[in-house]
From Swiss-Prot:
Membrane topology recorded in Swiss-Prot or TrEMBL: Multi-pass membrane protein
Keyword annotations: Electron transport, Membrane, Mitochondrion, Mitochondrion inner membrane, NAD, Respiratory chain, Translocase, Transmembrane, Transmembrane helix, Transport, Ubiquinone
Protein's recorded name: NADH-ubiquinone oxidoreductase chain 2
Primary enzyme class: translocase
Record-linked Pfam families: NADH_dehy_S2_C, Proton_antipo_M
Family as reported in the entry's similarity comment: Belongs to the complex I subunit 2 family.
Amino acid sequence: MKKISNNIFFIMLISGTLITISSNSWLGAWMGLEINLLSFIPLMNEGKKNLMTSESSLKYFLTQAFASSILLFAIILMMMFFNENWMMNNNFNNLLILSTLLLKSGAAPFHFWFPGVMEGLNWINGLILMTWQKIAPLMLISYNLNINFFYFTILLSMIIGALGGLNQTSLRKLMAFSSINHIGWMLMAMMNNELLWLTYFLLYSILSMSIILMFNNFKLFHFNQIFNFSMMNPYIKFFMFLNLLSLGGLPPFLGFLPKWLVIQNLVEMNQLFLLFIAVCLTLITLYYYLRMSYSIYMLNYNKNSWMLMNSYSNNNLTLILTMNFISIMGLLIITLIYLIL
């Protein structure tokens, strides 16, 4: 019975997002966001109940409900003084709606809830929060651009995403700050080209899925568990290492492709200062990916070697290997196809 209810909530989750992105009015978009929110809360509480999960779901609900109420208030204001359409002439209303959507997506300076919520979720729900839950608000943001405010948000997202992950021992919080940094890149892509941010988001989702499925399969949540991970299969360690480099955006892996496209676009638009800051801050995020890789290869903590005994399964091994192959070899395959055609 519980599995059936979870499937229903999952279908509602997908439906809410589709309603939002296909709506031709702000009120319809708001309704889709609410369906999405109310269907994700039960999914957050599935499985083993603990205080961290309950706290995360409550934080998520309060933050999203607050954002939804402000969004509804802004929509009502707009309907009172203007026509109910996508283009707005009122700067205050524009900024109010943009702020609520940034709060829903977890971008800086409205990111405060995101790492704390991620910490209390299992990896699969964390993956949904990092990817699917961002589609609807980011799509609405792309309809409602405010370039001056965008520069501030992009720079702050990249700074917080880079510096926030430096002193983290929790892998979930580290992935949360990584996600905040990637949101900065997506907003930067969105500023110049709508198709470009969708491409970036799709590739980011593939990379996140690849690494999170490995974390989930091997029950890795903290850095000290990675020390024990060093005792495992060397091929698995190698795949984990390459996945982290790919997520960091190093060539010749798939993670380099979205950054390459954004860099090319920024050079064409002559936004070199923004590009310089973005690349410098991304190097900091690459540092904490390399720190994880160093933990996998160099450190061995035998004292707790029993912790990982029988803690992983081979149930999703085919999916994990497929996602690893795409993440690691994707750019090379795309390049070969391009050269052949």
